Amino acid sequence: MAYPLQLGLQDASSPIMEELTNFHDHTLMIVFLISSLVLYLISLMLTTKLIHTSTMDAQEVETIWTILPAIILILIALPSLRILYMMDEINNPVLTVKTMGHQWYWSYEYTDYEDLCFDSYMTPTNELKPGELRLLEVDNRVVLPMELPIRMLISSEDVLHSWAVPSLGLKTDAIPGRLNQATVTSNRPGVFYGQCSEICGSNHSFMPIVLEMIPLKLFENWSVSMTQ
């Protein structure tokens, strides 16, 4: 959940987001070390009075600054490829939800159930209840079981959209005529907020996403009540 004046990432609520947070810290540490080294070398160059007027080349130095960046790139690429594979791989999902983007709302269809589909519009400010969040609440939340792999099929009916929930590490483009997929898994129950993350027109800022993750038993009761 985001909060005012937040400078860091949202708390990770899924295995993928935990991996992304660790990768962010790993990459940031490498960038910090490189920046410190470069600043140190620049300060030496500005303060030293020693010069080499007779040096034409330095094969050893050139070898080092060719091999060292290659090693650094490998250290960044290997965990990145691992996370990309984790985000793309979906093994035996217990549920499939089809998400369609529209100007300017989302529609959801639970493909494993008959007639379980609905549209999700932003709740206007004058209809908000005490404690609800402005520009983030919707009239129909997406209810899903926690701690289980769920496949989201994402597309669009009109223009480009992007279905994003930061605390779950989700951001998938909704492209007309193309079906993208993403894995949704939550480590704990809760309500998770997101928004359309692709500029899609004048009301782009009014396309919130709300996921409510609950235990499986409660989800079964909810699905029965929605299909009756």
UniProtKB/Swiss-Prot annotation:
GO terms for biological process: ATP synthesis coupled electron transport. Residues 46-59 are mitochondrial matrix. Cu cation A2 binds at C196, E198, C200, H204. Its EC number is 7.1.1.9. The keyword Protease does not apply. Binds a dinuclear copper A center per subunit. One of its GO terms (cellular component) is respiratory chain complex IV. The chain crosses the membrane at residues 15-45, 60-87. Gene3D superfamilies: 1.10.287.90, Cupredoxins - blue copper proteins. Belongs to the cytochrome c oxidase subunit 2 family. NCBIfam families: CoxB (TIGR02866). This is Cytochrome c oxidase subunit 2. The gene is MT-CO2.
